[in-house]
Every structure is written in structure tokens, then in C-alpha cells.
């Protein structure tokens, strides 16, 4: 069970949803009701669902399953990267490339290219190329690191995906669904929770 309490969530303001005119009716089971034009999230339910999601993720990791954290919103990028690295897992923090899951073998080509450039830079073998080509490979590495750097050591599809904003990452949710990969996501009152296996209603 997580150490986060309902009081912690309340103090963080996670109970404030979106304006009532911007809600998704599918989120009704997770809402107390409106207050001053804003929907209030049922944090008692959020806490139970949060604990359930944590237990599910923990169980997968104990069974050597990997976790992919996805958060490309500017506000989430640094946190996603930091927390994924802290627990030895993987992340996408800038852009979700179409086919990142459903066409993973092709994505691995980009990962292999990134690792190849890194290896040449580290052992100095890149210096056998003309200066112009070295500069181009340097720029290519920056782009590849931005796009696939967070998954360059992910050898197979993840056991579970954790998503900060399922509205923004709808393609990731869709790809996971096609492959039967469970999705854990933060779901605000304006979210469509369909396709999300472990919903965590709260303000995003």
C-alpha cells in the first residue's frame, strides 16, 4: 500500500476537477459533485484506486516486468524522466512516436543507431569520418536521444504503461490497448477513461 494519504491528496488540491461544462460524463462515478462551477473528485475512491494501481505495478516489477512512464506535457517532462530513472524504468518525455509499441521492431532501429553513434563518440572511432559528417551525427544523436533516449535500454515491450495525461497521449493508450498492455493513468474529470485499466481520478 502507498504512503500517500487522502489528506496529502487534499492538501495538494487533487480534488479539484475541471469546470462542470468541460466534464466527461464517463467520469461521473469518480466525482462527488459540483462546487462553484467545478467538479470535486472523490478522493476516498481515488486513494483506493491509487493503492490498487501501485500494487499492480509493484507485482509486475517483482515478476521482472518493465514499466514505461509517458508524460510529454512540459510540466511533467522533468518529473517523468527523474522518477523513471530513479526506479530503473523507462520513459517517453518529449514526443510519442507513432508505432512506438505497435511497431517496436522499427523503433529499435532508431535505438540501435543512437547506441552506435554513442559508442563511436565514446571510443573515438567517430573521428575517422569527415568533420561535416561528425557534426551531422552529433545532431542526429541529440534528436534520437530526445525521441528514444528514455527507452534505449528497453529490450522488449513493457509490462505496464503509466500515463500522466491520457487525453494528450491518446495514441499511446490506443497502441497499448491493441497489444493488451495494461494502462495506468491519471484521469481528470474531462478525461475519457475508456481504454484505461487502472484509473486514478484527480486533478492533473
From Swiss-Prot:
Name of the featured protein: Small ribosomal subunit protein uS2
Keyword Hydrolase (UniProt): no
GO biological process: translation
Annotated NCBIfam families: rpsB_bact (TIGR01011)
InterPro entries membership: Ribosomal_uS2, Ribosomal_uS2_bac/mit/plastid, Ribosomal_uS2_CS, Ribosomal_uS2_flav_dom_sf
GO cellular component terms attached to this protein's record: cytosolic small ribosomal subunit
A GO molecular-function annotation: structural constituent of ribosome
Entry keywords, A to Z: Ribonucleoprotein, Ribosomal protein
